[in-house]
Amino acid sequence: MIRRLDFINSSPGLIDDDVEMRSDLLSYGTCGVRFTKKANVNFTNEFKKRIIEIFKYFPELHNEIVLVGWITPRGWARGSCCLCSNASASKPLKISLQPNEKNFTIAHEFTHLLQARRKEELQIPSGERACDIWALTRLPLELIDDYPSYIGNYLMRKRWGTVKKRVRELAFNAIEIRKTKRQYIAWFEDEVKKLAK
């Protein structure tokens, strides 16, 4: 049986294992996440649960309808965000993901939505590198399961398991530094280089 699932912000277990999910609204009130038909067919329930779990860390989006679509696994793109500069605020936001993508990629794409809809309010600048920095600060350390793609260096990626806690702390510091200096990304990357020494 397929049924609609409703959520409350404080729900600890958002989805029961025995519930088959579809593209119905997975909601906070009347808003929340909807899976497209292709995503619903190609994503496992476990992956859908992870997307919903990550969505909890983006409360600014809970009053929006967010569509989650599917990207073919053959392509190079792990995730994408569909943003039209002239899109109406009443239109649903949309991200697309490859099946079973990492938590960090999911958070990165949700952060792009914040860049689009809450840029002024949250002071999140546009761009992929800024998106990586802000995404690092959104998730608890234990949910960060992959390194950022647009910032850092080879040694950071190679030693990710041992440096991710420090890199996340540097991301918080970089956001603070940005309040007074424009070169916060350069500062962040210089500090990451020092971790390899």
Provide a role label for each language-model segment.
Residues 1-34:
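N-terminal low-structure segments adjacent to metalloprotease catalytic domains
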Residues 36-47, 125-128:
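A short, highly charged nucleic-acid-interacting micro-segment common to nuclease
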Residues 42-62:
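Zn2+-dependent metallopeptidase catalytic core
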Residues 60-92:
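Catalytic zinc-binding patch centered on the HExxH motif and its immediate surroundings
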Residues 91-106, 121-126:
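Short pre-active-site segment immediately N-terminal to the catalytic Zn-binding motif
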Residues 102, 110-114, 180:
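Ampiphathic alpha-helical segments that act as solvent-exposed interaction surfaces
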Residues 110-130, 134-143:
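Catalytic Zn2+-binding segment of zinc metalloproteases
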Residues 141-197:
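Long, well-structured alpha-helical subdomains associated
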